[in-house]
Structure formats: structure tokens, C-alpha cells
Curated annotation (Swiss-Prot):
Disulfide bonds: none annotated. Assembles around the rod to form the L-ring and probably protects the motor/basal body from shearing forces during rotation. The gene is flgI. One of its GO terms (molecular function) is structural molecule activity. PANTHER family: FLAGELLAR P-RING PERIPLASMIC PROTEIN FLGI (PTHR30381), FLAGELLAR P-RING PROTEIN (PTHR30381:SF0). The keyword Ribonucleoprotein does not apply. The basal body constitutes a major portion of the flagellar organelle and consists of four rings (L,P,S, and M) mounted on a central rod. The keyword Acyltransferase does not apply. This is Flagellar P-ring protein.
Amino acid sequence: MKYILIKLSIVMIFIINSASKAERIRDLTTIVGVRDNVLIGYGLVVGLDGTGDQTTQTPFTIQSLRNMLSQLGVSIPSGINMQLKNIAAVMVTAKLPPFVKIGQKIDVMVSSLGSAKSLRGGTLLITPLKGVDNQIYALAQGNILVSGFGAQSGGNTSQVNQLNGGRISEGAIIEKSIKTDFDKREIITLQLNNNDFSLAQQISDAINTYFGKKSAYPTDSRTINVILSASYDKSEKVKFIARLQNIPIIIGPSDAIIVINSRTGSVVINKEVMLNSCAVAHGELTVEIKKRTKVNQPNTILGGGSTVVTPETEILIKNQGDSLQEISSSTNLNEVISSLNSIGAKPNDLMAILESMKSAGCLNAKLEIN
């Protein structure tokens, strides 16, 4: 009897673990106050092979060049109209990581602001990067790496990927760090990646089990406050957070969600989605308009006729109505995919079908339309 109970308990544990999975707190949450800050700057790219801005169309490029040269001690008479093709005005963006120190380097993104055809082979001149407080936090400069390429000949153009944007790896040097009071805080606030009351309480319980009672408490479906344990002083906060973030959390199945992007027509379905039995018919209405010009040239013996040009328009409407298609109930992702593929609908049509199935109660999932 004892052997049977032990064997049964092992089977039950296997079933529970197969339906749930263990995640670390660091994978489910972020720490409030520990985040990136965005930086932005305006600069010039030089050294382009005739693919820069058309200076007549982008006067701010020449204005920026004049200002830069004047700061370097080079003066250009106001009457001279410079027609340059190897320079481009750009916007430079970057993310300032948390706790970064002066002298460290970060990556920057460079994007064309004017009419430049390509930034390939260009060099970004020194560009100050500012935060929302208008303070300079970094200086960017370097050669731009453009992933795309293109060719043009005889009026024909071939292009792969984007040529008007590029990246400079470690292209900016930090000149100022952001002040923070993180080391003085006695309460660490965790923020869930997704709203979930049960998960917030579950994480709080796991922290209290690990560090002791009343160490953590949730304030809402997304926020958990964690009090620095009495066994850790402020100088050991990093050790405390490291152990906190690695606490395992056994979470159950996630919500059934279908994400629809109306612009690209993409549909993403997670494994929790289930379908109930239903019948679907989806018709397609096609309207085709053809315009042509008919020329009537009279061919008479006496002459005197004139050429008549008359437009002709043909409108063709097709209504391709499909018969009802039965969809059986599906309990896993493979069955859901097979059932939806049996309809034979295109992605754009599938979005309308899923919305109708949701309204009819045949789809047990949340629809997120972007």
C-alpha cells in the first residue's frame, strides 16, 4: 500500500509540473527606477559618395554646416551657395542604461533627416546627445554601419533593406551619469510585466517564504513592495536583490490570447486558445473597375470626318460566397491551427472570422487588435 501511494504521488507531481512551469522573479518583473533613459541629438554625416542631402531642398543642412565650420574657425562668405552631395543632416538616438558611469560607451542609431539617398560609408561628426531635461549626457561620433545596400543604373534602382539609417557600435561616450537614490531606498518596488492579481500575490508569498513574513506585500495587480530584510544592511542591497530575483515561481497556464495586427495582417495565437464547435461561411466581394480609351477614326471617301475619342468603363462585381464549413472543437494549438486552416481564409479574412467567432462564443480567448 505504501508503494502504491508513493507511486501515485510521483505521478501527480509529474502531472502538475507538466501543466505549470517555473520562472524566476527577474523574468516576470522589473524593478521600479531601474530603467533606460532615452537620448537624442542632431548632427551631420560626412563622407557620403554622392548620396547626401540635396542642399537646395534641405537648407538646414547648409546652415548646420556653416555653424559647425564657424566654431572650428572657418568662415564662409554669405554670398556663396554651396551645392554639396556628400553631407547629410541626421537625428541620433540612444538609450542610457541604468547605473552607467562617465567614460563608458553605448550604441547609437543614426537616421537621415533630409533627402539623403544613403548613409553608407558616412561618418557622424561629434554630436551631443541630450535627455528630456535638455542636459548633455553623451557625445556621439564614428563610422556608420548600414545593413542595407542598393544599386542604380540607367534609371533602374535596386535596394535591399533600409539605407537611410544605420548604427554605430559603442559610438557614444558617457559624459554625465543620472543621479539616483536607489542605494538609499529601504523598499524595493517590483512591477509585473503583465497585470495579474494572482501572480502578484503568488510572488509576494514566495518572497515571504524565502526572506520571512511581512517582507513583501502587493499593492495592486502589477506592483509588489519588498522591504529590505533586517539581516541585510544597505551595503548588501545588491546581494539581497540578486537572491530576490532568482527566487523560482511556479506559474500556471497563461491567459488565452490572440494578437491581431490589422496593418500587417499577422495573427499570433498562444497555446492556451481553444475553439468550440461551430460552422463558418465567409464570402468575398470583389469589385474590379477597368478603364480604357476607344478611338474612332472615320474612313470615308468624301473625307471631312473627325477623330472621336471616347472613354469606356467596365465595372465587374464578383461575389464568391462559400458554403458553411464545419469547425470541430479544439483543445490544443495544433488542433486550433488545423481547424482554422480548413477554412482556407487569408490572414485579413481570418481576422474578421476570429472576431465573429468570438462574438458567437465559439472562441475562448482574448482578442488584442493592434
